[in-house]
Amino acid sequence: MLEINDLKKTFDNSSPALKGVNLKINKGEFVSILGPSGSGKTTLLRIINGLETSSEGEIYFDNLKVNNSTIPEIQKKTGMIFQEFNLVNNLSAINNVLTGLLNTSSKFLSLFYLFKKNQKI
């Protein structure tokens, strides 16, 4: 479950990129975040994933308050695909995807060991 309470993010004392964001997503729900360019979608996702800090408000993930000490645990259960990204040139597509799982012990990761080394996915 993800719960966001009165989230606000301001950059450089300017107008807030996010203001008064409240959201609750229950386990198993699928949610889309839609809006025009510059409306704060990416900022919201970056805050949820611990890549940015909020100016105000609280976020809970699986009833765990998101803060500097809980971010590593939360990042084991979440992921983010960035709008702008760079591939590691000498890695295959699957290895580029798996680089985000380097510090996890996920059952998902174990699925990739079912494939033989030279088998294409």
Question: What is each residue range found by the language model?
Answer:
Residues 55-66:
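ABC nucleotide-binding domain "signature motif"
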Residues 14-16, 72:
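Short coil-to-beta microelement around the adenine-binding A-loop and adjacent beta1/P-loop entry
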Residues 34-36:
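The feature captures the beta-strand-to-loop junction immediately N-terminal to the Walker
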Residues 91-105:
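Short coil-to-helix segment of the ABC ATPase nucleotide-binding domain corresponding to the Q-loop/switch region
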Residues 78, 82-86, 91:
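ABC ATPase nucleotide-binding domain signature
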Residues 65-79, 112-117:
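ABC ATPase NBD coupling module
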Residues 49:
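Helix-to-loop junction immediately C-terminal to a conserved catalytic motif
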